[in-house]
Every structure is written in structure tokens, then in C-alpha cells.
């Protein structure tokens, strides 16, 4: 039986729990394409075609299954592949990725997220637990987090118990003293 009085820490999903993820991703992709446009217009056209890029990413994940949890490497490899495919400058891979990942951290929190984190962090240790590549410590809300665990760190994605166990270890508490909050009933509740 659940006893809220036992809770000492909260593990917290990020994307679509604290902010809507897709507007952030779309804006980051737009900024990356703007950066690439003067130097790699064919690459920009390819990235603008959602079916083409989805097909490429699917193939990359089939060939490299770890890319399914390592979204940064997947994105860098995608950029490299598309630049190479169109014989455009490969030295754009790292700066294009940096434009994307910096914009990826510019999230628009849901209206109550900041105040809720502030209030909760005064009573509980909060650990970010995400399959994504957002870095809470690069955001204003980072001050409310004790630690963060990503799928890349754990070597597995939610709902695998290993990622939850790593987050439990980061809190220093036992599993029954931790509440997980997320937006996905399958990914955030199975373990």
C-alpha cells in the first residue's frame, strides 16, 4: 500500500512532463537548418523532408541499435550521413549539432512546472530520469535537481528497471522511499 509519508525523493521525467517536447525539437531543427543553409543547401532540403530523415534514422538505428538510446550520436551521425550523401562540407557536423543541442535546452516549461519544482525540491531530493537528451543543469530549473540520469548513462531506456535502479542509487534512498512522476504510462510506470 502506498504511503506518501515515506517518500523522500522524486524521480522525474522531463519531456512532456515539465515541458512540451515537440515544439522545442522543431525549433531546434529549424535553427540547425538555418545554420546549415548557406553552406549545405541540399542537406537542408533533405532534413526538411520528414519522411526522408525518419527513414534514414530508422536505418541508422537498425544498423546501430545503441543509437535508439543515444540520441546525440544518432543526430550527429544523421548530420554526417546527409552531408556526405550530398557531398557538402563534413566540418559542419559538430557546429550544426551544437546549434541543435543548445536550442534543445531552450524549453518552454508548462505553466506550473517551475513553482512545482521549487516547492518539491524544498522537501524532496529530485532526480531527473529521461530517455531524452535534455540537460536540466543547463537550464534555470537545474537548481531544483539533486542529480540526473539519462538512458545513455544507464545503457538502457525506460521502462528497463536498470535506469530506475541507477536513479534510486543517486538518491541514496530505497525504492519504496521514491516516487516516479512521468507522462507515459508504459515508459514511466512499468518498472
Locate the predicted segments by residue.
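Hydrophobic/aromatic ligand-binding patch that stacks against planar heteroaromatic rings
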Residues: 191
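Substrate-recognition "cap/lid" segment bordering the active-site pocket of phosphatases
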Residues: 127, 132-179, 185-187
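Substrate-recognition element of Asp-dependent hydrolases with the DxDx(T/V) motif
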Residues: 10, 91-152
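N-terminal helical cap/lid subdomain that shapes the substrate entry/recognition surface
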Residues: 3-111
